[in-house]
Amino acid sequence: RRQRQMCIRDSQNSNQRPIAVMIDNNVGNNAHEGLQDSYINYEIIVEGGLTRIMALYKDKDVVKIGPVRSSRHYFLDFSSESDAIYAHYGWSTYAEKDIKALGINNVNGLTSNSAYWRDKTIKAPHNVFTSTEKIYETAQKMNYKTTTKDWKLLNYSVKEITFKDPADGEEDNRLLANSVSLK
């Protein structure tokens, strides 16, 4: 039986920079590791009708994430909108070009393999794993910032919002459309 280890950080929605990790979704009989601890998962169709997952992590120490796979360029917008450090093991031609052109802070296992390890009990290439700690350590060595002033990732307000009920004759807080244009 597997044990899952995770530690939630003390501060809720801190200024810690998120991590986006590319995860294989064609793992056969092998289980994903760490998906349950992410803030959000993006699943997008890649070549051959398969899907790949990009998981975003923030304010959690996750000790095993994977299996980590290569980057695809169509995930980069989702990673960038959260100012995430982008973690992957290899890349497609388009992803490599876009990552370099856009200056995306990325931890690539082909060049920064200290952030990754292989589980020898699983057949390659589905056996590469990482952790949030290893990604942050490697990002610091690469002089990437590990904090952010961008509060884009799931920054919910706890302020209560009340709307009046028109059924009770209350008409405030209505949103009126003064004009509608269809083209």
Regions found by a protein language model. Give the residues of each.
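A surface/extracellular/periplasmic glyco- and lipid-processing/surface-interacting theme
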Residues: 5, 9-42, 47-183
